[in-house]
């Protein structure tokens, strides 16, 4: 081990996020109920025969008509797909991912040592210039891969900084348009380099929101990184208020520092009546709070309509989902970075991320494993304002088919997603995207 490597010095990617902390739509973002067939036009219908919803012992048929599941008979001439006794499960939602940064599908990238958020951000810039594949192609490649693994929607954070201009949001926007048949995407303009500490960033965030390139504007560690709590929140919430976009702020700050920032975010949300439009991601100051303090904070978050996201990084940093949900706080699960300058890990597979959530939570019981899956399927859906896909009549015909015994076993074994269905149409088969 090199004496100055992150491991030798105790500075890891996770450690940097935690240690530094110690020192805030496009039409494609919402899944509207499928419209009824226009007069004179036949309904678009598919029957998925011989499937087992949630691992039911007796196979049944799922009938999709114009994008919705129905209890009625399929119209004459409906397409038939044989499920072969596979288990049908709802597709999932990635509530926090960075597709603009990815080197997914590129030649292997050797990462350089980094010891702070600022240094990791510098590595982002180096990788951006080193990769030969255009950002929009890399983002689309990763987002398409996510579809093949059963993701139906995602909230994509794209860096906004003078080093990139708006290339990130434009590239992810291009991928969103090309994958709109298979994937809902919400885009966040993310100021990875800081809102205040990097001149020119606030103007780019304003432009991205004004032109409709983003659905949300982001922020990052207002105290620990930007060192300007009020000024950063003035900018972020001001842009959101002026342009009618949401907010999603990265908050890695811990303990009292994180709580100070979080309570300031709560106050801004209430003051501008942005309830239901604000998310705080990671929120490392919440895990480990004493029970009474956690309950009080959860009640404040719920009253302000603020949602949270976690990427299940470790047992000590994952959010206490059950306790938060009991107070009415919505919590989404996400992939975070995937094969980028920050980490060689990640795969944009939300079933795997739900598996990791169960693992860091020491899940043993079937109901605990099922709850981890529901966090990936339902938590993000509620965050993005999407209808849940519980395989019942009237729900979106969005589901995946896998071989297995039951849901808990599938979460543990992570079998191949044999078929991915979006609005009643097969969009991926055997790990590959199908035609549009």
Regions found by a protein language model. Give the residues of each.
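Alpha-helical scaffold segments that flank or form the walls of functional sites
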Residues: 105-157, 163-178, 204-210
